[in-house]
Design a protein with these regions (language model features):
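Conserved helicase RecA-like core
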Residues: 2-386
Length: 386
């Protein structure tokens, strides 16, 4: 699959024909010039084309669909016109904040609708005239099934992290939402950092003559992110190596990934007991506690966060300079999502993969698939620039 051949690239936001009020929001939010995905995708979606868009993590996918979809909202109609489906509450909240900030000079009403939050508040907000809704499939389907969230005025349907949204976990929920029905004029966009063949096949059934903006996997660059590995003979040596890294590196903010809740909690308890300040977050935690801990990390009050793949996708924490994979992810697609947390928006970043023998096959698979080479971690960690 290749990108469409006739895509016009816009070097500035001013060239895109965006409303002045939207441009003010874009610039006040801190954007200066479009990223590659923004330069290629905003105008086609704004002008009524379906989009299949791929760009690696941290390149501005969220702003791409927020900007283009806001252009399609009829400000005189106080009904839902944009629906954005995402896999996690944290990602929904992030997109909601981006939409609010970019649209700050527009009279656009936005709603973040996810499980764990009051559905009464969601219903009230929609009845008051919400125009853009971002949420997780379960809550969105519930609101649609109650005939509270209706689609007759829907201009845009967006699936973010499409590779995850169209896999088994969410596939049925997403299909139920689609089966409720959207007008033929509703434009659909799928965005993700990775586009496995299976997902492209499903996407082709959902999209009408889409503009394809695809970066092949071997070109999904992790430029600016130095990738190291430590190969160990025994699993139980991992903790000691992690402590050595912790002691020697001057870390601004770091994410440490484990594959399961149990493993994350074990590691967090062990590090805390040994005097290392950090927090742990996972999908089975109470929503209020997850939000609290995420805010602590995002604000910089907590510098190290241990996580499962809950945070691998789409969470924008600007000052993360180091990602440590205490365990390699169980699928190669999550590798790029994980280490994309460092080196956001062109900043330098570093990832360290702590490996035991049973992870060698996955390491080789990742290196081959993404055409990368993980370097041996130098003994002198002072040579690593974060």
């Amino acid at each position: 699959m290749e990108s469409s051949s006739d895509i016009k690239i816009y070097e500035t936001f001013d060239e895109m024909g965006l409303p002045d009020t939207l441009l003010r929001g874009i610039y006040s939010y801190g954007y200066e010039k479009p990223s590659k995905i923004q330069s290629m995708a905003i105008v086609p979606f704004k002008e009524g084309n379906d989009i299949l868009g791929q760009a690696n993590s941290g390149t501005g996918k969220t702003a791409t669909f927020c900007i283009s979809s806001m252009c399609r909202i009829d400000l005189t109609i106080k009904k839902p016109q944009v629906m954005i489906l995402v896999p996690t509450q944290e990602l929904a909240k992030q997109i909601y904040e981006v939409a609010k900030n970019i649209g700050v000079y527009l009279p656009v009403s936005c709603l973040c609708a996810t499980g764990g939050m009051s559905i009464r508040d969601d219903i009230h907000a929609i009845q008051q005239g919400v125009q853009l809704v971002v949420g997780t499939p379960g809550r969105i389907y519930d609101l649609m099934n109650r005939n509270i969230l209706t689609t007759e005025n829907m201009k845009c349907l967006i699936l973010d992290e499409a590779d995850q949204m169209l896999e088994d976990r969410f596939y049925k929920q997403v299909m139920c939402i689609l089966e409720i029905g959207f007008p033929n004029t509703t434009r659909v966009a799928l965005f993700s950092a990775t586009m496995p063949k299976e997902v492209i096949e499903v996407a082709n059934k959902l999209l009408q003559n889409p503009v394809r903006i695809l970066i092949p996997p071997e070109k999904v660059t992790l430029e600016g992110i130095k990738q190291y590995m430590v190969q160990l003979d025994k699993e139980e040596w991992k903790y000691e190596v992690l402590c050595d890294i912790y002691k020697q590196l001057n870390i601004n903010q770091a994410l440490i990934y484990c594959n399961t809740r149990k493993r994350s909690e074990w590691l967090a308890d062990k590090l805390s007991t040994d005097g290392y300040p950090l927090m742990c977050i996972h999908g089975e935690m109470e929503n209020s506690e997850r939000r609290k801990r995420m805010e602590e990390f995002r604000s910089g009050r907590v510098r190290v966060l241990i996580s499962t793949d809950l945070l691998a996708r789409g969470i924008d924490v600007q000052h993360v300079s180091l990602v440590i994979n205490f365990e390699l992810p169980m699928n190669r697609e999550n590798y790029i999502h994980r280490i994309g947390r460092s080196g956001r928006f062109g900043k330098k970043g570093c990832s360290i993969n702590i490996l035991c023998p049973n992870e060698t096959k996955m390491k080789d698979d990742i290196e081959k698939f993404y055409s990368i080479v993980m370097e041996e971690l130098p003994l002198d960690l002072g040579s690593i620039v974060l």
